[in-house]
Every structure is written in C-alpha cells, then in structure tokens.
C-alpha cells in the first residue's frame, strides 16, 4: 500500500460524509482514480468491469473485481479478504450475461436494493448498458 490504513479510513469517512450530505446511501464507484483513492487498488484491468462499493455506514468499502484481478486487490488494498468480491470470468463478453448480474445479486444479498444509489455517470468505463442493468436489476433503488 502506498498510504497507511488510517489514511484510507480517513478518505472513506470523507466520502461517506459527502454521501450523507447528498442523500446517497450506497455509492458504486467505477472510476479507477476513485477506486485507488478509496482502497489502493490500481490494477491495469480497468477495461473490464470493476468497482468499489461504499455503504454510507460501512467500516470498509467492497472491491468488486474479476477473478483474474483478485490477487492484485489482495496485495494492493487494505481491505479484509471478505470485502474483496470476485465475479467469475464467465460474465465477461458472454452476452446476455454481464458482470453487473453478480453485482446486482450482491446488492440484493446485502439488502441494499432499496437504498438511494449513487453512480459516476462520467466514468470512462461505466457505460449506458451498465446503467441500464442497474436500473432494471434494482428497480426500487
């Protein structure tokens, strides 16, 4: 890690404070810079679906990555192993499956599907298709 665990915790608290001020209960961050800022994750696999999920009251964010990139997340982040969420490679380029399918299931499993969710609409790899998958998969969010 380039920074201390305490530094990352302070960054998380700042983001959560901003989320509270904006009424956001769950943040899905796909921007690689923001993912790195929050966790230290810096893999050069940004062209595949990956994100950091921040619950407004969580002690740690979740890092959602493909199986092949999990090793980098274990090494480069301060996160506990259980907060690195791995999706299977079968979701990559196998339409109609998409990596947001297990992301949506993760959100439902944690009972977050009715929360006010914030996303980065100007993030380079957060496509209109990703946005539509979230809207369709989480209609009550």
Q: Residues of each region from the PLM?
A:
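A composition/biophysics-driven feature that prefers long, compositionally simple stretches
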Residues: 1-141
């Amino acid at each position: 890690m380039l920074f201390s665990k305490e530094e990352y915790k302070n960054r998380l608290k700042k983001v959560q404070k901003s989320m509270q001020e904006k009424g956001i209960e769950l943040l899905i961050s796909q921007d690689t810079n923001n993912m790195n800022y929050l966790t230290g994750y810096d893999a050069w696999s940004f062209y595949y679906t990956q994100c950091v999920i921040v619950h407004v009251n969580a002690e740690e964010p979740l890092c959602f990555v493909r199986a092949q990139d999990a090793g980098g997340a274990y090494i480069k982040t301060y996160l506990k192993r259980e907060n690195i969420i791995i999706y299977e490679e079968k979701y990559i380029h196998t339409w109609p499956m998409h990596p947001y399918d297990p992301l949506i299931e993760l959100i439902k499993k944690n009972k977050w599907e009715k929360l006010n969710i914030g996303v980065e609409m100007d993030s380079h790899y957060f496509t209109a298709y990703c946005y539509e998958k979230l809207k369709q998969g989480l209609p009550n969010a």
